[in-house]
Amino acid sequence: YETLKEADYNTAGGYYNAAVNRLYYACYYAASALLLNCEIEANTHYGVKTQLSMHFVRTGHLSLDHGATFSLLFEKRQASDYSDFAYCDLALVNTLRPRAEAFINAMEQLINKE
């Protein structure tokens, strides 16, 4: 949950692109932990997204909403890190923050089931 705190810190400072980056990484770390716990290999960020979808969303173990949250954060992080004209605002961060926390909680629940 430290990475969520980093997102909050960046949000408070007005660094919304950085906040979205930290929200993504908080979810990425949680998703990676789930995959590792289940001995599912993923070597890239795209691989984590693909494996999560294939093994958990498509099988119904993870809601479509959580899958969509991770995909949206993946896209926003890509854009904010690699595009010259990407702009995240407070409204976006405020929308994504609770969704990211819910995603992380879902990862934790799935890990504890295994």
Regions found by a protein language model. Name each.
Residues Y1-E114:
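Terminal alpha-helical segments
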